[in-house]
Structure formats: structure tokens, C-alpha cells
């Protein structure tokens, strides 16, 4: 076979014409130091704050400190395979996570990756975890109720859509249980729920997921889990990941609820990172920007105005106190950021009052505008009655000769305390709460022995559901107790009491 010279030149010519010079440029650096989830990297001069850097083995790191000759990086994974001198590549991307309906019913890590073994996520889009909170013009005042299913909260410290209500108390006082009840109460409301576990035991997170699954609530809930064994940067970023996913619904004109369990552990993780990054410590060794850590997170919970879709994001952050000290640094910070707090007390919990809510110290600063009128009508005097009861109960220990009025207040208070007790994972619809509290505050339970109050309440609600459903439906529909509803409710309670035996 003879090769012709012109053919060779033609082939070479074609090759030259079709040649594409592909040069892949990437700015790289070198690891100077690594340990405890933190790395110092030299040579990535143009790195941005919050940018992702790629380490060997596919581990990502997030730039936190921008210094003169190196950058401080928080590693979003294990630092076991990374050593001094390893190459580090810039990605040019800001840390983002998947959002959309694909995350519903899933258990994810703070990077937005599934850890439940149910396959990949079908994401609508990806969004940065750090997003600026809505401005003043974009917001609307809280005016719609967000029921929790707990009588003590819905009656006296009501929560509205778009509110930030702090759940604060010592360990083992039922903080998580209150929040899980709030999730279970959203079954009929169409609110999308997010539970962010920060620094929890893996067994605790598994128990939460199992509880939600058993009650049919996991299908509208997403769990973001940064457990105690995860590196500090993952515990720090988990809350922002959950918030970004929940904001998708707020910005789509829908409603979302997010629970941060708990922000005390997030602050501890942030303190650990800050000290390792050599940032100067302040009070209780926390860095100076620990207030901003929580304020920029909680300010993203909002009720947005009608022109932006009228969606909302409600936040229930949890803070764990030490021996009831609410004047410590982190508790006071979060109390000042939120729109009220529900204070849970160990003494009440141990006395069998569950949920163990201290009515005197709990407050909702904006929720009153969101409470349904029917509840306002029946529970208006409740807080005062309970406050007087607590005061008189302390004095009543000293003397037995009480006048009629004092005795009546003590009896009414004891019955109200009993009425506000509620079993775990049994949220109560608003119309049933109204009927139950109406019976107590209007004196229909005054002749019922204190130990029989809960049995009386359960039997009364069963009676109303079975024979006088029209009364419950009227309360649900009108959301106000007018003359007709009051007359029907009084008659129904009287009819029930005739057939009820203690």
C-alpha cells in the first residue's frame, strides 16, 4: 500500500483545523495544618468567605477565616485522610443545598445528602445556606394561628405563623416532646415541618424519626441530623441548612415550621471552631459574634407580605439551661431575639404537670394577634386565675382557715392545672380545646373532684364528638363563641353531666 504525500498533508491539515486547546485552570493551595475539623490552607488568595474548597478524598471545606497569608477552613467531613502538604482546590461555589418537595419525608445530613437509605433526592433547585433575611417592607405582622395542639400553649402563649417562639428549660423537662407535638398537630394544616437535630445522640434522632413515622407525620417532615459524633462544622451549619430548605416553602407562598434542637449545642460547636481558628474569646469563651450567629438564623423566620406570596416560616428554637439559669449568655441572647418563650420547669415536670410549662414566666409577644377569637373568649382569665392560684397556694400552706372566695380560687386553680395536663403525642384540635377550657373557666367543672378532671374532660369530648358534633363544628367554622354557640355548648355540657358519674 502506497501512502500519497497529499493525503498525509490533508490529514495533518484537518487535525490542525479541528484542534481544540483545552486548558483547565484551577487555583490550588496547600494544607499547612489540619486537626479537630479545622484546616489552614496556604495559596488560595482569591478564596471567598463561605466558599467550598475541595480536599483529597472528595472532602469539602468551607472558608471561614480570610487572613493575610492563609485561610482558615472548616472541614465538612472527617479530617482523618487529610495531612499537611496535601493539595487543595478552589471550587468557586458557595455552600448550597437541595430544596423542594423532594426533601419531604427524608432524613438528611447538614450537606443535604440523604442518610436514610432511600435513594437520591429529587431536588427542585439548590440554594445557598446563608441567605439574607427578608427586609422590613417584605414582612407582614403575625396574624394567623399556628396551632400546637397543646392546651397550655394555645390558650396562654399562642403562636402565630411567622413567629419565633423559644422553648427553654433544663435537660429532661420535655422540650423536644413539646416540639414533636407541634409537628403532629400540623397533620391537617398543610404546614411543612423541619426538625434540625444538633449534637443529639444518634439513638435520639432515630427515636424522633420512628415517632413521626408511627404517627404518620414523617411524610410532611424533613429531619436534618448533625449528631454528637459529627465534626463541629457540621453541627454549626445544620441549622442554616434546615432554614434554607424551609425558606423554599415560605418563598413559594406556603407555610413551614422549623425546630432547632438545640441552639445551645450549636453555640458550643461554633465556640469550638472559633477558638481553633484563633478568634478572640469573649464572655463564657464564646466569640464576639455569637449573637449574630443566632440572630441571622432566627431573623429568616418571617411572615411575608401578600405581594411576595403571603408565605410564612415559623421557628421553634430550643435552648437548654443549666439548673434553671435563664440569665446565662446564650439564653439571654436568644430570649432577646425571639418573640416570646415557653419556659419548662423541672419541679413541675417531677410533680407530674406535663407539659411542664411555667405559665408565669412563659410569654408570647406577638401571638395574641394570631389567637382565634373563641380561644381568647374562653381563656382570657386563665393566666390570671393560675397566677392567683400559685400565689394563694403558697400562703395556704401556713393556715387552714380560708374564706370562701380564697377557697374557690384555690379549687378553680387546681382544676385548671389538672386540665392543662396532656399526654405526650396526643395534640388536641382547637375546637375541642375551646370546649374543654370553656367547661373549666365557666364553672362547669367546679363540682367535679380534682382527681377526676381528666376523666371528665375525655368523657365530655367523646360525648360531644358522638352526639353533639354540631357544637364542635360550629366552633371550628365560626371561630367565635356567639350566643347560639354558647347556648348549645352549655346545653350539651349540662346534658352530659346528667349522665356522668364520678
Curated annotation (Swiss-Prot):
Annotated SUPFAM superfamilies: C-terminal domain of alpha and beta subunits of F1 ATP synthase, N-terminal domain of alpha and beta subunits of F1 ATP synthase, P-loop containing nucleoside triphosphate hydrolases
Residues that, per the record, bind ATP: 169-176
EC top class, as a word: translocase
Annotated catalysed reactions: ATP + H2O + 4 H(+)(in) = ADP + phosphate + 5 H(+)(out)
GO molecular function, one term: ADP binding
Subcellular location per the Swiss-Prot or TrEMBL entry: Cell inner membrane
Membership in a protein family: Belongs to the ATPase alpha/beta chains family.
Matches recorded under HAMAP family: ATP_synth_alpha_bact
Name recorded for this polypeptide: ATP synthase subunit alpha
Species this chain originates from: Desulfovibrio desulfuricans (strain ATCC 27774 / DSM 6949 / MB)
Gene name as annotated: atpA
Amino acid at each position: 500500500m502506497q501512502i500519497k504525500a497529499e493525503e498525509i498533508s490533508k490529514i495533518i491539515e484537518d487535525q490542525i483545523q479541528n484542534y481544540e486547546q483545552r486548558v483547565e485552570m484551577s487555583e490550588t493551595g496547600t494544607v499547612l495544618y489540619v486537626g479537630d475539623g479545622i484546616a489552614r490552607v496556604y495559596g488560595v488568595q482569591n478564596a471567598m468567605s463561605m466558599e467550598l474548597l475541595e480536599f483529597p478524598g472528595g472532602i469539602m471545606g468551607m472558608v471561614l477565616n480570610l487572613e493575610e497569608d492563609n485561610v482558615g477552613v472548616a472541614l465538612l467531613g472527617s479530617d482523618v485522610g487529610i495531612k499537611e502538604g496535601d493539595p487543595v482546590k478552589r471550587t468557586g461555589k458557595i455552600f448550597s443545598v437541595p430544596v423542594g418537595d423532594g426533601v419531604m419525608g427524608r432524613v438528611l445530613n447538614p450537606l443535604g445528602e440523604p442518610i436514610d437509605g432511600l435513594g437520591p433526592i429529587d431536588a427542585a433547585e439548590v440554594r445557598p445556606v446563608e441567605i439574607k433575611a427578608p427586609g422590613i417592607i417584605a414582612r407582614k405582622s403575625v396574624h394567623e394561628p399556628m396551632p400546637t395542639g397543646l392546651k397550655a400553649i394555645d390558650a396562654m402563649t399562642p403562636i402565630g405563623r411567622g413567629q419565633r417562639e423559644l422553648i427553654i428549660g433544663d435537660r429532661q423537662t420535655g422540650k423536644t416532646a413539646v416540639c414533636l407535638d407541634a409537628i403532629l398537630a400540623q397533620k391537617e394544616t398543610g404546614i411543612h415541618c423541619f426538625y434540625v437535630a444538633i449534637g443529639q445522640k444518634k439513638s435520639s434522632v432515630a427515636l424522633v424519626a420512628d415517632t413521626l413515622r408511627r404517627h404518620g407525620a414523617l411524610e410532611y417532615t424533613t429531619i436534618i441530623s448533625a449528631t454528637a459524633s459529627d465534626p463541629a462544622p457540621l453541627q454549626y451549619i445544620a441549622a442554616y441548612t434546615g432554614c434554607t430548605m424551609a425558606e423554599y416553602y415560605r418563598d413559594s407562598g406556603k407555610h413551614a415550621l422549623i425546630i432547632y434542637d438545640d441552639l445551645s449545642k450549636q453555640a458550643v460547636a461554633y465556640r469550638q471552631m472559633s477558638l481553633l481558628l484563633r478568634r478572640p474569646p469573649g464572655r463564657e469563651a464564646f466569640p464576639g459574634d455569637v449573637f449574630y450567629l443566632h440572630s441571622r438564623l432566627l431573623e429568616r423566620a418571617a411572615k411575608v407580605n401578600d405581594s411576595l406570596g403571603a408565605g410564612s416560616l415559623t421557628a421553634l428554637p430550643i435552648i437548654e439551661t443549666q439548673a434553671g439559669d435563664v440569665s446565662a449568655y446564650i439564653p439571654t441572647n436568644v430570649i432577646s431575639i425571639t418573640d416570646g418563650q415557653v419556659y419548662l420547669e423541672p419541679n413541675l415536670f417531677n410533680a407530674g404537670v406535663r407539659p411542664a410549662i411555667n405559665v408565669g414566666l412563659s410569654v408570647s409577644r406577638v401571638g395574641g394577634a394570631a389567637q382565634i377569637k373563641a380561644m381568647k373568649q374562653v381563656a382570657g382569665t386563665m393566666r390570671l386565675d393560675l397566677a392567683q392560684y400559685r400565689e394563694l397556694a403558697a400562703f395556704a400552706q401556713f393556715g387552714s382557715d380560708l374564706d370562701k372566695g380564697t377557697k374557690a380560687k384555690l379549687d378553680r386553680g387546681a382544676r385548671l392545672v389538672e386540665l392543662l395536663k396532656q399526654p405526650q403525642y396526643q395534640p388536641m384540635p382547637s375546637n375541642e380545646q375551646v370546649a374543654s377550657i370553656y367547661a373549666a373557666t365557666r364553672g362547669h367543672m367546679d363540682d367535679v373532684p380534682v382527681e377526676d378532671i381528666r376523666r371528665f374532660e375525655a368523657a365530655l369530648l367523646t360525648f360531644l364528638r358522638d352526639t353533639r358534633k354540631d357544637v364542635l363544628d360550629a366552633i371550628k367554622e365560626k371561630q367565635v363563641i356567639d350566643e347560639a354557640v354558647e347556648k348549645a355548648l352549655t346545653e350539651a355540657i349540662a346534658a352530659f353531666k346528667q349522665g356522668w358519674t364520678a
